[in-house]
């Protein structure tokens, strides 16, 4: 039976249950934002420079894996500029007219945030080029030989685009961003600070050791850390005295199948199939997906990125291979002659 990727507690994607809580935990200034020190410093310079000049900053592209705070930074950028924020997403802009309507309603210094900007439809993207560069759009009226193009001015604005796949952006769109910031995964110590702040806002009693325990299982992602904190809170309120200690956190995360490295049932199923059924590989992702009863896209896009980053799975030209760390994590010994990724694979 296949698993809905968004139902996993360790999914970095925004789920329905995250929505309202995610907003309440969102930092309101660069000073409050935890982690990403290099990005924060760069943004502070971009924002302050624009404020000193009394103009709008360059268009800003935020790239990086999901759950690291790109939307939060967009909200902060608008707040730091004292500007209104208009939010939309790439998939919502299917036609050029959708974008034209939004651009025509902007006022000077507004911030327009487009999430998943790599998924914007081509007609809307081509209209965006002109709006970003010249602050105008050409609206086509009529059809066929009688169609005419009417230029419309757009108030000077700042576009903040967010993407998890910067390589999927077309060159012309990427080149129109004056500043690009790449966000990296968080260190456990940074996630501990995120958890302490979130616990304070949510009124959760969180022990220091408990924060460290949750942080190291959060895959370097604040969104996952906050979600696990809420699950542990539920456990503490129902089965303990409401106080989250390290033992309570460990017991709660065991209930939700999140192990000490942040792997869940699906991750371990992939590793188990790779080691037990295929002797460590190499094996193709489609075959591996059949072995665990999942779609190949789920294994490749949901499980594999973290397993590769954690050093448990290696991608080679011949297929996926379990590393020594994967065998160790499962408490197994690699059989003699087990395949290991070569130096140049």
Curated annotation (Swiss-Prot):
GO terms for cellular component: cytoplasm; Holliday junction resolvase complex. Keywords: ATP-binding, Cytoplasm, DNA damage, DNA recombination, DNA repair, DNA-binding, Hydrolase, Nucleotide-binding. Residues 260-345 are annotated as: Head domain (RuvB-H). Mg(2+) binds at residue 71. Disulfide bonds: none annotated. GO terms for biological process: DNA recombination; DNA repair. The keyword DNA-binding applies. Pfam families: AAA_lid_4 (PF17864), RuvB_C (PF05491), RuvB_N (PF05496). Residues 1-186 are annotated as: Large ATPase domain (RuvB-L). Gene3D superfamilies: 1.10.8.60, P-loop containing nucleotide triphosphate hydrolases, Winged helix-like DNA-binding domain superfamily/Winged helix DNA-binding domain. Its main location: cytoplasm. It catalyses: ATP + H2O = ADP + phosphate + H(+). DNA binds at residues 315, 320. Its EC number is 3.6.4.-. PANTHER family: HOLLIDAY JUNCTION BRANCH MIGRATION COMPLEX SUBUNIT RUVB (PTHR42848:SF1), PTHR42848. The RuvA-RuvB-RuvC complex processes Holliday junction (HJ) DNA during genetic recombination and DNA repair, while the RuvA-RuvB complex plays an important role in the rescue of blocked DNA replication forks via replication fork reversal (RFR). RuvA specifically binds to HJ cruciform DNA, conferring on it an open structure. The RuvB hexamer acts as an ATP-dependent pump, pulling dsDNA into and through the RuvAB complex. RuvB forms 2 homohexamers on either side of HJ DNA bound by 1 or 2 RuvA tetramers; 4 subunits per hexamer contact DNA at a time. Has 3 domains, the large (RuvB-L) and small ATPase (RuvB-S) domains and the C-terminal head (RuvB-H) domain. The head domain binds DNA, while the ATPase domains jointly bind ATP, ADP or are empty depending on the state of the subunit in the translocation cycle. During a single DNA translocation step the structure of each domain remains the same, but their relative positions change. Belongs to the RuvB family. Homohexamer. Forms an RuvA(8)-RuvB(12)-Holliday junction (HJ) complex. HJ DNA is sandwiched between 2 RuvA tetramers; dsDNA enters through RuvA and exits via RuvB. An RuvB hexamer assembles on each DNA strand where it exits the tetramer. Each RuvB hexamer is contacted by two RuvA subunits (via domain III) on 2 adjacent RuvB subunits; this complex drives branch migration. In the full resolvosome a probable DNA-RuvA(4)-RuvB(12)-RuvC(2) complex forms which resolves the HJ. NCBIfam families: PRK00080.1, ruvB. This is Holliday junction branch migration complex subunit RuvB. It comes from Mycobacterium ulcerans (strain Agy99).
